[in-house]
């Protein structure tokens, strides 16, 4: 396993007004690491979805605003983003299977609300893992060298 080149950590209130700050920070981190414009934009959307989910769902039963922890681990070939909260947890696999995939032939007028964030995050990032102990932690990886992005489900090795 490669060692981390840089590690950046943020701790912010679980409030929607901080999403733009997180997006701005992500842009700077990814630009500094040499990521492409498309990778930056995809990652901004995925991280915004994950943070918005934490803001909307993690602390909904608590009158106080909780905290969100966010960290970026920069490697030579990838950036790992970890977002965690200490709020309400959920069963990721059950939620995914309950919502099910969206089909191209579904009428957009009857498209169900909610759950798009999970599918969006998984489609925009190269690897996504959700842990649900003491809140929810979402780990996302974006490979920043195109040669290492998955090809038909298989990782392309560079010699």
From Swiss-Prot:
Superkingdom of source: Bacteria
Enzyme class, broadest EC rank: transferase
Gene Ontology MF terms in the entry: ATP binding; protein serine kinase activity; protein serine/threonine kinase activity; sigma factor antagonist activity
Keywords: ATP-binding, Kinase, Nucleotide-binding, Serine/threonine-protein kinase, Transferase
InterPro entries xrefs: Anti-sigma-factor_SerPK, HATPase_C_sf, RsbW
Enzyme Commission no: 2.7.11.1
Catalytic activity as recorded in UniProt: L-seryl-[protein] + ATP = O-phospho-L-seryl-[protein] + ADP + H(+); L-threonyl-[protein] + ATP = O-phospho-L-threonyl-[protein] + ADP + H(+)
Entry keyword Amino-acid biosynthesis: no
SUPFAM superfamilies in the cross-refs: ATPase domain of HSP90 chaperone/DNA topoisomerase II/histidine kinase
Similarity comment: Belongs to the anti-sigma-factor family.
Function: Negative regulator of sigma-B activity. Phosphorylates and inactivates its specific antagonist protein, RsbV. Upon phosphorylation of RsbV, RsbW is released and binds to sigma-B, thereby blocking its ability to form an RNA polymerase holoenzyme (E-sigma-B).
Protein name: Serine-protein kinase RsbW
Organism, scientific name: Staphylococcus epidermidis (strain ATCC 35984 / DSM 28319 / BCRC 17069 / CCUG 31568 / BM 3577 / RP62A)
Gene name of this polypeptide: rsbW
């Amino acid at each position: 396993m490669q060692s981390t080149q840089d590690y950046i950590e943020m701790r912010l209130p679980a409030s929607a007004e901080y999403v733009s700050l997180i997006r701005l920070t992500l842009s700077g981190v990814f630009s500094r690491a040499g990521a492409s414009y498309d990778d930056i934009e995809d990652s901004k959307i995925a991280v915004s979805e994950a943070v918005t989910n934490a803001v909307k769902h993690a602390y909904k039963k608590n009158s106080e605003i909780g905290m969100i922890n966010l960290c970026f681990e920069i490697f030579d070939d990838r950036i790992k983003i970890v977002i965690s909260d200490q709020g309400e947890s959920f069963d990721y696999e059950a939620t995914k299977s309950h919502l099910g995939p969206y089909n191209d032939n579904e009428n957009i007028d009857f498209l169900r609300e909610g759950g798009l964030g999970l599918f969006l995050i998984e489609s925009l990032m190269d690897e996504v893992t959700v842990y649900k102990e003491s809140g929810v932690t979402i780990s996302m990886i974006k490979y920043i060298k195109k040669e290492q992005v998955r090809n038909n489900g298989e990782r392309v090795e560079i010699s």
